[in-house]
Amino acid sequence: MLQGPNRGLLAVFGSTLFQLVGIFMLSPLLLLMLNQAGVSNTVAGLFAATTWLGIFIITPFASGLVRWIGRRRALWLASGLPLLTVLGFLSTRSLPAWFVLELLASVAGGLRWVLAESFIAEFAPPNQRGRLIGAYATLIGSTMVIGPALVAWLGVDSPHALWAVLAMLVAGFTWTFLIPRVPAADDADSASVGLRGLWHAVVAHPVVMLAGFVGGFFEMGLGSVLPLYGLSLGLGAGAAALLLSVSGFGGTVFAIPAGMLADRFADPARGRHRLMRWLVALLAGAAAAGFAVPALPLLVWPIALVWGAAGGTLYTLTMLDIGSRERGITLVNSTSVLVLTYTLGALLASSCAGVLLDWSPGMVFPAVLLSVAATGWWVLWRSPVK
């Protein structure tokens, strides 16, 4: 039987597989159900942004909660609460209630996100950390493919779709009980928590956090509204949902090679920084291609691929950078800030994208994306490697 770190890695990977398949089924399913109900793109975009708002709310308090109840209990709490919210989606079609349920689910999801990534970084051997974090990112990317694909297969009108989501979440929750007991962190009494701890992490890793913001903006923020983008271009509901799968496929393909490459850098910090610059430049190119989408709608497919590939790999590198530097509660703090900046990028993108798609999908929408990518590239280019 697997023991210690190996068992912990397997448990985190297994729970993540099932829970995120459920989550990535739920997100496009709810958006498409709102569209069928006649809800505007603006309101639907705000609903998508609620996901990131909940994550943004919980991350400042993650390290304090972990110190209070422990890492395993916190993970059980974060994995169990979404089960109740899906039961709520099954029982009501009230739009205000759906906003509340989505907020609760995203609070739990944010806590689980921080804990799972800190577990991976702590359980992974130092000489294999890049490939294991890359494998974890690949797993996440695969769930972004599988979840929307299952929605397209089951159909938005299927009475079994939400029940399938619930089954996936139950399976993921069960896997979390295999995580072994972990000793108290060495810095449990000395590390800062809450807002003070977050501020220390921001000061320690400002450029990494900016890269996390850009990754969140393109991979998850824009990814969450890809179905709306597809519908605005005249795609059917099934094809619009599959845009999410294309984005997820991009992150899946490149995460492990990026992690393996990062393990081989002679100067790891400098190598990661250089690769981040190239990835942000690629995102800028994809944003510029958005100006041609109204005339060439098929361009939306490679653009979605680049958003997922470059944005996801960018986040993988930031996660690896944090995991290579920190341990214990300090690692939870730094992971929380990384999740916070990634979430802030996703929240900004998803909340603005619906309005921009309603207003000017061919000009203002790509112009905003290009400005974000260009700003990120300029800061990364000018910043020294620490």
Model-derived segments and spans:
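Helix-loop boundary and gating motifs at the non-cytosolic
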Residues: 2-52, 205-211, 219-233, 240
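Helix-to-loop junctions at the C-terminal end of transmembrane segments
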Residues: 58-70, 155, 254-270, 357
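Structural signature of the two symmetry-related core transmembrane helices
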Residues: 73-87, 272-288, 370
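Cytoplasmic helix-loop-helix junction between adjacent transmembrane helices
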Residues: 103-138
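Intracellular juxtamembrane helix-capping segments at the cytosolic ends
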Residues: 111-124, 312-326
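Symmetry-related core transmembrane helices of the 12-TM Major Facilitator Superfamily/SLC fold
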Residues: 162-177, 365-380
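A late C-terminal transmembrane helix in Major Facilitator Superfamily
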Residues: 329-358
